[in-house]
Amino acid sequence: MSFSAETKDELARIEEGKRCCNLAELAALVRMDGTLQIANHSYALNVITESAPVARKVYRLAKNLLGLPVDIMVRRKLRLKKNNSYMVKIYPRTLEDLQQLGLLDEEGEILPGIPNVLVKKKCDRIAYLRGAFLAGGSINNPEGTYHLEIITNDPLHAEALSKLLNKFHLGAKVSMRKNWHVVYIKESEHIVEFLGFIGAHRALLEFENVRVLKDMRNQVNRLVNCETANLNKTVDAAVRQVENIQRVANTIGLQALPEPLREIAELRLEYPDASLKELGEMLVPKVGKSGVNHRMRKIDELAEKLEEQSKRVRKGG
């Protein structure tokens, strides 16, 4: 089972709470996954999902909360690796039942977006978002890219969901993917907050554990890369120093150098892999890293001058 499916399974098993919260959650599930049929002055709501726990939740809420007749049917897929789908058929008795779910207004017209009456309180907003995620949401495995989304084919509902999420400062945005409107969250901290308040505590812990391990691995990689870069710089500097010392030795000889420069030059030729600090500790008396670096710069400058003189002589000849 994927991380997303495990998260939904956990959310679908949360026990029902207050009536207002249950109504908000059912309204989101029906709005996202349901279709309304009207024939001969009678109504039917068909809610289709591939999740058995979600189907059971819709069934339970519609039956216990609104006391409506409900049927549940399984549609078995014949193709390999395809999940079964479940259709929960709800039979509202009156227009008022549909109004309670925020689907129709008093005139029987379809209501756009999310009716304010369903999400007045914080607990209702959380319940509605939980229902919306159960119906149309998904979350990436935290081992990969951080991404949580809820998809809908209704642009007004997408904007309303985004605003609802951003009441909790979750940085939600909306984009288009083919004919779908995608409400998404990218920041890992915001995803953690969302999982926490909708009640996916087990998923949250797993997400956090993976995130901590990823951060540790990234930090170690950064340190290794930094150490490697520093080592490469040290090696490059040592190679350059040896080349410059050899240029001086071949041109004027090391004996022509002042004693402090000659000593460090001879040590560098003898210990080409040593660090500046290690070279300084070999001197008598010992010299600090900055002192050794100063002497090496003097040798580099002298080598450059000798190279320039050599070029002029060759050019003149």
From Swiss-Prot:
Keywords assigned by UniProt, alphabetized: Cell cycle, Cell division, DNA-binding
Cell cycle recorded as keyword: yes
Molecular functions (GO terms): DNA binding
Ranges annotated as DNA-binding: 275-308
Metal-binding as UniProt keyword: no
InterPro entries for the chain: Homing_endonucl, Sporu_reg_WhiA_N_dom, Sporulation_regulator_WhiA, Sporulation_regulator_WhiA_C, WhiA_LAGLIDADG_dom
Any one of the GO BP annotations: regulation of sporulation
Family: Belongs to the WhiA family.
Function: Involved in cell division and chromosome segregation.
Protein name in the entry: Probable cell division protein WhiA
Lineage of the organism: Bacteria, Bacillati, Bacillota, Clostridia, Eubacteriales
